[in-house]
Amino acid sequence: MKLKPPMTMMDFFLKSEGTWFSQRTVHHFDSAQDESGKSNILVKVLTKDDPKVIKVCEQQKVNPALAKGGASFNWQDNLDHGEPNPNYSAILVDIPDSQTGRTGKFLRNRGYIESIPVVSRYHFTNDGVLTIDTEYEKNQGQERCWFLTDDFRVRINTVRMMNGVNLMAYCSERRCITRKQLEEIVQKNAARS
């Protein structure tokens, strides 16, 4: 089956909904040592009338009627199965430029590089690669993300800091199946034998 990449931010959020296992490598272009790690990313799609979406719009003085919807992102340690820590979460709200939805901005209640509310610009290329550009108070960030399959995606981040230090991160992310999905697979396989 041929992959149909998302071409709007809401399609991207919908395709991303669920839990993802993320393996990350960060390369520092100064004297700092490179880093690597594993985590889970939990994504939940939010409708345009969700109170979290409206709150982010109001905090950033944007008319909530312009929002198409949003998503909540939570990060947690790979082996942590408890409730996500709210300090490792963000709400993103989609504000497309036009009806095509291929370009626009999204509002974040908390930035990725600096933990402050921020507005990012995004666009999708013809082959479905999402590029996000963010200007922070002291840094600039760019993220590119694309799906290789419905259950595997890649993210590349670059950060340019005011002190001249640059870093780059590479993430490969695999969709995790839920316990219910696993039980359904086991039942199907048991029925075949």
From Swiss-Prot:
One of the record's GO molecular function terms: lyase activity
Keyword tRNA-binding: no
Gene3D superfamilies, A to Z: 2.40.128.20
Top EC group: lyase
CDD domains membership: lipocalin_CpcS-CpeS
Top-rank taxon, per record: Bacteria
Pfam families found in the cross-reference section: CpeS (PF09367)
Function: Covalently attaches a chromophore to Cys residue(s) of phycobiliproteins.
Family note: Belongs to the CpcS/CpeS biliprotein lyase family.
HAMAP family in the record: Chrphore_lyase_CpxS (MF_01459)
The protein's name in its UniProt record: Chromophore lyase CpcS/CpeS 4
